[in-house]
């Protein structure tokens, strides 16, 4: 079974939308909103017949999102919708009771033996605002880390390698993001000797895979070369609007294993060192974006750039030293999710790292540099949430006294931020918006123990602090 599991639950009650909702809307209208409150996490789904192929993936095309406000028959959402929700597809909404603010850090996992189930070393299902940092995971069954029906999960500074099985049917994955999961950040990780290092399937949307390093892909049970398995993979059942940026791997595969992938998946400034970029064509997945990628191998049968389907956006891709399409050499875009160079790339002089106008095949990301130098995880480093803009993250606060017998003060807060205080069980016991840069909180009526203070911005958690209450 799963070695570590963070397991929330999906509420049984269903509410129905009463009108069409459209991509980029930040509200939905329901028959009744009485059961919903600001701060609730919900899953919006619909009849996705024709979009998903697999029975196990039905109902996964949608979005997991937090309610910002509730007024009359309208729910206002914390983020914009990433897909249309036509009334003819019978869109519905259900509350999620998630595992929140859990962290797994600074440990090594070794799966000592295989089992007959599709089990994972770390599994998150119906989880929100959770972090996995500095973990080495040795030998997988299905996936080293599986993220299902979750949002705002971050995985960074990890080393995931090897598997008991590399055959089909779900074996040998690094990080699997699936089942409507969205707004997750997979950043600065190292993958080695896996069937699929980074893989999306079953309605996953709005996720970012940034600046990871993957080597030695390997699969069995196929007539294709053993090192030709995709390590950056869209696996079908309508994944859409995801971003792969700054990764170094061996091949991007947009496959048809489980039918079509949805639109607007973006591959930006990645380097592929072996077979390159390949899309299956039965059926093809339309409307993909490929910008500033490098395909470097000149070995016979490698170095591919094969797309099928229609309405792809292509710009500035360097394929074996030649820019494709011709005439798109000038690419000024630096990042599609960062506003400036992130701290984990401080030791990398070239930024952006990959792609035109840089010299072809020059530059390494931090994960590749670390692997070359025998640094497989980064544990104990300051962890900054990647789900907010850089300006939102730049918060320097003081919390005192700590431990406290009752009252404590948080200074240095920017107006507009929010404070949420949770007990050790994850129960919200206090929340307040910052007005003047300082907040006084009284714990005198609560039990002794450890409490967590989340500093919140519009994009999620900016910083988490710990406070101890003791008499």
Segments predicted by a language model, with ranges:
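Extended Gly/Ser/Thr-rich low-complexity repeat segments
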Residues: 35-50, 83-102, 421-422, 455
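Extracellular beta-strand/beta-solenoid scaffold signature
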Residues: 1-9, 25, 85-95, 115-123, ...
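Right-handed parallel beta-helix
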Residues: 40, 46-70, 74, 100-196, ...
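Catalytic domains of carbohydrate-active enzymes that cleave complex glycans
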Residues: 222-224, 236-237, 242-384
